[in-house]
Design a protein with these regions (language model features):
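Outer-membrane beta-barrel channel domains
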Residues: 1-199, 409-411
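Exposed, low-structure sequence patches enriched in small/polar residues
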Residues: 35-37, 43, 123-421
Length: 421
């Protein structure tokens, strides 16, 4: 539901990301599972325009790994205005349930509140978003705000958009997703579409350009980098697509970085700019087909070396009973000595069975040689009432170093019930 997910700016300033709950950091800095004891989520409509949502989760303490028990809450209100626009308020709270000697004062709690306005014109030409968020921690600080804006206009031939965001150095959202703090980012985008006359195969051609400029005002090197992405796209009448793309990147490393994540390897040195260009070719067949394919090839420079990637997704379905897909991603990273080179594989099949209108079974399997992990997630769903479901979820994870060794295993029962008042 957008009540719990549609906040901030995707990838750069997301104050709430539900999958952060249940994940913690141990004493060695490793990311590990933090068991969830209980939780609930409520959402509903007060009237035709006003909706509210409340989510609360309690996680288990793990003193051996220096992890306290936390209570995490999100409360949100979203109200529709004008033809299609809306505004929203939210409050996020992550707080220790008791005092712990091993928890630093500034980590005892984290609170974020915010306001957002989402613009959508009646004719669909104008869209946009503006937001302002503020975080609160036990330590007083001045640069604890985050705000941003995006405004877009879309016509038959032109699509133009301009966005910008700021996240303060002291802003924190423990339940959110932020790749960095203390930055300013600008993201202009333009697309021009050509509709050929009397074509029996092509819907339109599109020329587009996207740029991203990132600044770090309080760093010694205040310019972090830029991306310039130019592409040519063809959309066919049968819903297949073809695209050619050029990516020109310039990144500054503030910290040593190993893009291969090879244990014990020498990372790329920090305090340097890396400029590189790569190219991408992508093609996808219509999803409506019995068998469909999405394929992408990327090749070119990568930091001070080269990279070759192939991403494939194969889908097969027999409606309405069965649907399966297979993702195969391969990355070959070649860096000059003494830096590491590596071939990285990600293989992920998915199976979906529909037994009847009320019972469904979905299974995900994922293997990657980068983290040497094999994961299985299997979910049985029973829709016992309108918008109400009972889930039985099985999770299994294995290390694949030499031999397959179990990492952790869990069985969860989840109930979703719609109360119509």
């Amino acid at each position: 539901s957008d009540l719990f997910t549609d906040f901030g700016q995707q990838r750069d300033a997301e104050p709430f990301f539900s999958r952060r709950i249940g994940i913690a950091t141990d004493l060695d800095g490793n990311t590990i599972e933090n068991k969830i004891i209980r939780g609930f989520r409520l959402s509903g409509k007060i009237n035709d325009k006003l909706r509210i949502g409340l989510l609360n989760v309690l996680t288990e303490e793990d003193k051996a790994n220096g992890i306290p028990q936390n209570n995490s809450t999100l409360f949100t209100i979203r109200n529709k205005v004008f033809a299609r626009s809306n505004y929203a308020f939210f409050f996020i709270n992550r707080e220790n349930t008791k005092n712990y000697d091993f928890v630093e004062n500034q980590k005892k709690y984290n609170r974020v509140f915010g306001f957002e306005y989402n613009l959508a014109s009646e004719n669909g030409e104008w869209s946009g978003r503006t937001f302002i968020h503020k975080s609160i921690t036990p330590e007083k600080n001045d640069k604890n705000a985050s705000f941003g804006m995006r405004l877009s206009k879309n016509t038959r031939k032109h699509y133009i958009s301009m966005g910008g965001s700021y996240v303060g150095d002291d802003f924190r959202s423990d339940l959110g997703y932020y790749r960095r703090y203390g930055f300013i980012k600008l993201t202009p985008f333009y697309q021009y579409r050509i509709y050929p006359k009397n074509s029996t195969t092509v819907l339109n051609y599109a020329l587009q350009h996207y740029s991203a400029y990132v600044f770090r005002p309080n760093k010694k090197e205040s310019f972090e980098g830029r991306w310039n992405i130019s592409s040519f796209e063809i959309k066919y009448l049968n819903q297949s697509e073809f695209e050619i793309k050029q990516n020109i990147k310039r990144d500054y490393l503030y910290y040593d970085f190993d893009p291969t994540r090879t244990e014990g390897a020498i990372p790329l040195p920090a305090n340097n700019f890396y400029s590189y260009t790569d190219y991408e070719i992508a093609y996808s067949t219509p999803d409506k087909n019995l068998f469909s394919v999405r394929s992408k090839v990327n090749f070119g420079d990568f930091f001070n070396g080269t990279k070759f990637s192939i991403n494939n997704e194969l889908n097969f379905r027999v409606q309405p009973y069965f649907n399966t897909s297979l993702k195969i991603n391969y990355d070959s990273i070649e860096l000059p000595e003494p830096y590491p080179s590596r071939d990285i594989w990600l293989i992920s099949p998915k199976f979906q069975f529909t037994f009847n209108k009320k019972t469904f079974w979905t299974t995900y399997v994922q293997y990657t040689n980068q983290s040497k992990n094999l994961g299985i997630n299997s979910r049985l769903q029973w829709r016992f009432a309108p918008l109400s479901d009972l889930y039985l979820v099985y999770n299994d994870n294995y290390f694949t170093t030499g031999s397959i060794e179990p990492q952790f295993r869990s069985i969860n029962l989840k109930l979703t019930y719609w109360i119509n008042i």
